[in-house]
Amino acid sequence: MVVTGVAGFIGSHLAERLVADGHEVVGIDSFEDYYPRSYKEANLAGLRQARGFSLVEEGLLALSRGRDQGPSRLEELLAGAGCVFHLAAQAGVRASWGQSFRIYTDNNVLGTQVVLEACRRAGVGKVVYASSSSVYGDTDVLPMREDALCLPVSPYGVTKLAAEQLCRLYWKNHGVPTVSLRFFTVYGPRQRPDMAFHLFLRAMHEGRPLEMYGTGNQTRDFTFVDDIVGGIVRAVDGRDGAVYNLGGGSRVTLLEAIRTLERVSGLSAQVHGEAVQAGDVEHTWADLTRAREDLGYTPQVGLEEGLRREAGWYRTLEITPSR
């Protein structure tokens, strides 16, 4: 098994699950400096000691560069893999505007294309691509179904949708067995330091006002990381060329989520309202019918329990948040 983006929030959880299930796992990560390396090192602390895990610290584009003779390093790493879980990406909706867009096209679009091309040449059993609910854009048609028209409202969402289309093209034209998964607002232990609940917990621990964009009445389908990992693993048996939503199974306002976070953490939140940011959507909610019927996917962890676990993890952080 190969996991790209293995040092990240979801990638590290997935690799741990695969190793625990008895698989040999090759993890690939460039340690992109979108957030401090110390967080990623902490994510990998257990895996580095695990039997059956090896790490390749290099970017996908660098690994894909051809040699004078023979396959690229990326092809060698992927050769004969039972599954390539492609989670590597440039994250963040709000940071994807302006000059930063080049980074997103390189990492999310071109990075996916070189993985798919290497998989085509190397002959892998399956490619599971981590997409995002951001591809849907701002819609009042809820819950969101996989066959809906996708009109993303951020450059990040555009790159994730483009990568989905590449997966479909490589399946249709070259027979590469791909599955694309649209993740809905993933949270839990190891959540990236730029993500909402992590930021909220930091502000609450430091006694500062937390910044909430919009009125707080916008809704999200929050999905606990263990449920996402379970869905990713099940996707190995998904229909080739298919797209699946992976959500938490409920729709909650941001204000409700903050009140729940207060309750489970024992801390109070001073909420400071900010203007809605470009690229943000009003509502998300996953239709899980296809994932339930094809994959047997059913989320197990509700928001209160999931936030309790994230709050407990945050209290144990040994990293200096501002590092």
Which residue stretches match the model-derived regions?
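C-terminal substrate-binding subdomain of Rossmann-fold SDR/epimerase-dehydratase oxidoreductases
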Residues: 14, 23, 204-323
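N-terminal Rossmann-like NAD(P)+-binding domain of SDR-like oxidoreductases, especially those catalyzing
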Residues: 1-186
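NAD(P)-dependent short-chain dehydrogenase/reductase
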Residues: 42-45, 141-143, 153, 165-236, ...
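Residue-level recognition of oxygen-bearing side chains
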Residues: 73, 83, 110, 192-196, ...
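Short, solvent-exposed loop/helix junctions and linker helices
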Residues: 4, 106-109, 157, 190, ...
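Conserved strand-to-helix beginnings and helix N-cap segments that scaffold or border functional pockets
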Residues: 37-38, 67-71, 98, 193-194, ...
